Amino acid sequence: GMVMQDFALIEEYTVQENLLVPLIFGKVKKREQSKKIMDVLEKVNIAELKDKRVNQLSGGQKQRVAIARALINSPEYILADEPTGALDSNTSDDIMDVFEELNKNGHTVIIVTHDNGVAARCQRVIEIKDGEVLSE
């Protein structure tokens, strides 16, 4: 799953419709789709927004929809580009808790960040500048 820094959501779709797209491509059975959507929305604390259009959401809410979309098919690998950039500190902590739980359950989570607080919560940090590895 991929979390884009600019969210890459379909603005005219509802939250639920945005999450349905990867389920359809992932060939998830129709009867399982609603449950998967609600489960992932609850995980990122935005279940109440499922019927809202994305263009009506705040930046932090869009960020959580983008994270939910990346997680919806339970991918083995998750690449998250600045996944907490649009979030307040409490929500950022909650999302990092989700990533840590996924990691404990065998998922590989790669986070690209400029936030030292986020980096401090990672198991392994690689510092890169101008394409060169500065430290590991």
What are these regions (language model features)?
Residues 67:
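Hydrophobic anchor residue at the start of the ABC signature
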Residues 52, 73, 105:
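Conserved signature/switch motifs of ABC ATPase nucleotide-binding domains
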Residues 53-57, 61:
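Conserved ABC ATPase signature
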Residues 13-20:
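Short coil-to-helix segment of the ABC ATPase nucleotide-binding domain corresponding to the Q-loop/switch region
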Residues 5-10, 24, 115:
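Catalytic "switch" loops of ABC-type ATPases
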Residues 78-81:
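Catalytic Walker B motif of ABC-type/P-loop ATPase nucleotide-binding domains
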Residues 32-44:
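ABC nucleotide-binding domain "signature" region
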